Regions:
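Short, small/polar residue-rich loop motifs at catalytic or cofactor-binding pockets
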Residues: 42, 65, 139-141
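Thiol/disulfide oxidoreductase modules built on the thioredoxin-like
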Residues: 117-121, 127-174
C-alpha cells in the first residue's frame, strides 16, 4: 500500500473517531440531567388529561409490559420529524408496548391540536404540566424514557432518534 493511501486511511479513521467522540460527548451532555437509568429507579407516576379531557393514570408499579413515554413540544421542529417514527413503531408492536406522547411547554390546547393535525397518531396524547416536566427532568425536546414491565427506567434519550435506534432501545431489534 502506498504511503499516501495509508495516510488517507489513517486520517479518515481519525476523523471518524473524533466525530464519534463528539457525538458521545453531546449525547452525554444532553442526558446528564435526566433521570438515571442505570439503577432500579421507578418511573414517576402521573395523572394527565388527554385530548378528549379524560384523565389517564400512569402508575409504574402496576406495569405489565414495557412503556415508551415520549415528551414533545408543539413548537419543536425535531418533534414533528421524530413523532412519526414513534407512531410507526407503535403500529408494528402489536400492542406489546404501551405508548404515551406527552405535550409539554404548550400555551393552549389548540396549539397541541395544531401539532397533532399534521400527524396521524393513534397513541394517547396527554397534556403535560410543569410538574410532569420536573418529575421526569425534561430539559429539551423531544425526550423519551423506556420503562420496563416492572416500572423501572430502562433507557432515555433527548433529541432526534431514528426508528431503528428506538427499536433497538425497545428490544424489538437485536444487534
Amino acid at each position: 500500500m502506498k504511503k499516501e493511501t495509508k495516510k488517507k486511511i489513517v486520517s479518515g479513521f481519525n476523523q471518524i473517531l473524533i466525530f464519534l467522540g463528539i457525538f458521545i460527548a453531546i449525547t452525554w451532555w444532553q442526558q446528564k440531567d435526566m433521570l438515571p437509568t442505570s439503577s432500579s429507579l421507578r418511573a414517576p407516576n402521573f395523572s394527565l388529561v388527554d385530548m378528549t379531557d379524560n384523565v389517564v393514570h400512569f402508575n409504574p408499579s402496576e406495569q405489565t409490559q414495557k412503556t415508551l413515554v415520549y415528551f414533545f413540544a408543539p413548537w419543536c421542529s425535531v418533534c414533528h420529524i421524530s413523532i412519526d417514527n414513534i407512531e410507526s413503531i407503535k403500529q408494528s408492536s402489536d400492542g406489546k408496548i404501551n405508548f404515551y406522547a406527552v405535550a409539554l411547554d404548550w400555551k393552549s390546547k389548540q396549539e397541541v391540536e395544531t401539532f397533532l393535525a399534521e400527524h396521524d397518531l393513534t397513541m394517547p396524547i396527554l397534556l403535560g404540566t410543569n410538574e410532569t416536566l420536573n418529575d421526569f427532568k425534561i430539559g429539551g425536546f423531544p425526550s423519551y424514557y423506556v420503562i420496563d414491565s416492572n416500572g423501572i427506567l430502562q433507557s432515555k434519550d433527548m433529541g432526534y432518534t431514528t426508528e431503528i435506534g428506538m427499536r433497538v432501545r425497545l428490544g424489538l431489534v437485536e444487534l
